[in-house]
Amino acid sequence: MSKLDGFIEEHDRESNIDSGARLESTKPSPKVGSPAQRVRQNGVKSPILQTQATPAKPSEQEHPLKETPTRATAGGKMTRSNTLKRLSLIQPVISPETTPKEHRQQQATRNRSRSVVSVHSRSSSSASEQLADATKDVNALLQLLANKELELLETKHKIEELKKTLTQEEKALLRQTHELQDLKTQVGKALNSGIDEQIQQQSQSSHHSPNQRSLAVPTSHTPGNESRPAHAKKESVWTKPLSFLNQFDQLIQHELEKKLNWDDVASPEKTPGAESGTLSGRSASPASYNNGNSNNNNNNNSNRGRPNEDVLGNMSSSLWSFVSDVKTGLLGINEEEEEESAEAPAVASSGESNNQLRFVGSKNNSEVELKEYNASKRQ
């Protein structure tokens, strides 16, 4: 026993107060307390990890400051009020019993449940945060998906529009190619029609002048005619008047032979002078023909003024002068053109100069020269 307990017992004896019963009645029921509560055991303070016990509210009867009537002693003496003050100063120390093992196990399970609940609350909060983040991520992914689908639709529309434009361009290209082919055919027809017309004109001119083919001299060996196709075209223009001139010359010669009674002379043939006239006259112009006609008219007028001594001689001289003037005029123009164009062969010019016929002398000598010329030709 401690000194304090002995002092309390002595005081109870003196004051005739049983404080032990009051202490037993004031024992609180064991409750769960905090683990930091300190308990006195045998006067030694030692920390014990124990649940904190909340003291119960004392009743009015158990309150230490309550005024309780003191019992009268045998001597009839009254106790002093100081005792009450002393009792109020001395607080009863309650030493609660240790908690049993079952209570400790229950407390541990409760703590565990609390810790589990706290952990669950923390995990639930983190899970809720994760769920919120996941929902946010899902929304973002859905938005991206929608945007991608819209982009794909736009690209598909663009591709369809490009295909439509491509088909339209292809149709336009085909139409243009058909138009080009039509134009080509039209141009070909126009050119062919022009060529056909030229061929027809040439064929008609060849039919109208059959004597030219028989009287024409082959000039395929001459390099001048091969190098100048334009000159050949110009010659073909004068084929008709030259053939007419050749026929006129033959008629004149035939009439002269009839009037002169040249029976021993053969039928009139084409003289070298006429051939030279036809060859040289191909490149002649109508101006030379007009000049020849004018010269012939002048000669005829001059011959008319002369005295008509012999009608036959006058006729023959006038005719042969006309022929000679025409031939010399044609040959002179041909020589000028040959001088301008240096591509003409020298052989053709020499042949033309050799084939010239000149009737020099009076009206009586012309017949003799013509007979000599025919005799030399037959030899």
UniProtKB/Swiss-Prot annotation:
The keyword Cytoplasm applies. Residues 114-128, 200-209, 283-305, 343-353 have a biased composition (Low complexity). Residues 125-190 form a coiled coil. Residues 1-133, 197-235, 263-313, 332-379 are annotated as: Disordered. Residues 1-16, 59-69, 366-379 have a biased composition (Basic and acidic residues). It is found in: Cytoplasm. Keywords: Coiled coil, Cytoplasm. Its main location: cytoplasm. Pfam families: TDA11. Residues 39-54, 211-225, 354-365 have a biased composition (Polar residues). GO terms for cellular component: cytoplasm. Belongs to the TDA11 family. This is Topoisomerase I damage affected protein 11. The lineage of its organism: Eukaryota, Fungi, Dikarya, Ascomycota, Saccharomycotina.
